[in-house]
Amino acid sequence: MSPKLAVVTVTYSPGEHLENFLSTLAVATTEKPQVIMADNGSTDGAPEAADAKYEHVRLLRTGGNIGYGGAINRAAAEIDSSIEFVVISNPDVQWAPGSLDELVAAANRWPRAGALGPKVLEPDGSVYPSARTVPDITSGVGHALLGTVWPKNPWTARYRQENEAVTERAVGWLSGSCLLVRRDAFDTISGFDSRYFMYMEDVDFGDRLGKAGWLNVFVPSAVVTHAKGHAAGRHPELMLPAHHRSAYQFQADRHPHWWQAPLRLALRGGLAVRSKIAVASAVRERARTDNSTDNPSVSNHGGK
C-alpha cells in the first residue's frame, strides 16, 4: 500500500530537539513516512546528522532564512502528489506513542477536516491552549493589551478557549507547532502565506481554511509535547517585534478598506508601542536570569 503521509519540519539549528522529534515520530505511527527538513540556515550540524543517519529523512536547504511558512511551502512542493496527508511540525515536538495514527483516524472521521491538531503539552506537563477562536479586532486588541497583566480577562478567555471542554471538536484555528493537514486543503488555499515570516502564520492558515469551507479539528486523544521557542526565546529583541508585525498584518488583511485606514493606523501605532515595552521587559528578564545564573547567591524570589 502506498504511504498516506509525509512529514515536513523547519529547522534552524534545532540541536538535540531534532533527534527527539525523529525518534518519537517512529512510535507515533505504524507508517514510516518520508520526512523533509526544510532548513533555514542551521549552523549546528543537526539536520546534516539526521540526513546521514535516517534513510527516510531528507535535508532540503531553502537557501537562507525564508521564514516558517515559506519554508513549509518549499518542502510541501517536493512531496509526491499521491500523498494524502502532510504533517507540519516544529522540530522541538515530541510525539506520544500512536499520536499520529490518532490524528489520521480523526481525519477519517471528519472528511471536511482540512487541518487536525493534537493536544499540546508544555514541558512541565501542563496543557497549552492550542485550539482557539480566530481573533476579531475586539478580542485581538483585548488579549494583546491585557493578556499579560490580567490573564483571566474575558477577551483572552474567549480567544484562548481555555475553559472549553477537552473534546474532539471543530475550532477556529490550531497551533502550527503540530498539524496534520489534508493535502487537498493545503493546495486549495496555496499553503501558508509567506508574508508572515514567523508568528500568526498558523492563525492566518486556519482562518483561510475555514473561509474555504474546510474545518480545523482539535483531537485531544493525540498528544505531543512542545519545547516551545528553542530558537525564538534566545532573541526577544528580534522575535517580539516580528510577532507584533505579524499581528498587525493579520488584522490589516482583514480590514483592508479605505474607510478602515484610521483603524489600521491605530493598530500599527499601538502594536509598535506594545512591542517596545515587551522587548524591554524581556531583555530585563533575560539579564536578571543571567545574573542569577552567574551568581547563585542571588535569590529568584521576587514581588511579581
Regions found by a protein language model. Name each.
Residues 163-223:
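A short, conserved alpha-helix in the catalytic core of glycosyltransferases
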Residues 23-32:
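Short, acidic, metal-binding catalytic loop of nucleotide-sugar glycosyltransferases
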Residues 94-129:
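Conserved donor NDP-sugar-binding/catalytic core segment of glycosyltransferases
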Residues 24, 39-47, 64, 96:
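A conserved acidic beta->alpha catalytic loop
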Residues 61-81, 102:
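Glycine-rich, basic loop-to-helix element that forms the pyrophosphate-binding segment
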Residues 82-94:
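Short beta-strand-to-loop acidic/aromatic patch adjacent to the donor-nucleotide binding site
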Residues 135-171:
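Short, flexible, basic/aromatic active-site loop/helix in glycosyltransferases
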Residues 204-285:
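Active-site-adjacent helix/loop segment of glycosyltransferases
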